[in-house]
């Protein structure tokens, strides 16, 4: 965390990194605050129209799903409804391949 490519919408305990194309990836850990991640999701959706959320491990996936639900509430106040499309993604961390859950979030 502390990467120089993070946006203002990055939640404490989460890291936003540029992805392919225009989609940003928010990396969520089990220690991430779901409300802070939700604010980051809502901000990026408003600004760019879509965001991917990546989580590894049950606790991180739980926080990411809660954040998506909370972000939906924030965005509904602005008349924006979202959909969450889950998928698996293989990532390499410290030389070891891990499977992450990736949530692609976009307007409905």
Label every PLM stretch briefly:
Residues 76-108:
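C-terminal edge-of-domain segments
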Residues 1-13:
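N-terminal acidic, proline/glycine-rich, low-complexity intrinsically disordered segments
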Residues 22-50, 64-68, 72:
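Conserved mixed alpha/beta catalytic, RNA-binding, or beta-rich assembly cores of soluble enzyme
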Residues 58-84:
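Short, hydrophobic/π-rich interface segment
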Residues 11-23:
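N-terminal intrinsically disordered, low-complexity tails
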Residues 32, 56-59:
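Short beta->alpha linker loops
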């Amino acid at each position: 965390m502390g990467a120089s490519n993070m946006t203002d919408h990055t939640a404490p305990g989460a890291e936003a990194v540029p992805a392919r194309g225009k989609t940003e990836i928010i990396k969520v850990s089990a220690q991430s605050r779901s409300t802070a991640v939700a604010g980051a999701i809502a901000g990026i959706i408003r600004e760019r129209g879509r965001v991917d959320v990546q989580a590894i491990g049950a606790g991180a996936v739980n926080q990411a799903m809660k954040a998506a639900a909370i972000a939906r509430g924030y965005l509904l106040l602005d008349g924006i409804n979202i959909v969450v499309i889950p998928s698996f993604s293989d990532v390499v961390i410290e030389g070891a391949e891990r499977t992450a859950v990736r949530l692609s979030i976009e307007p409905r």
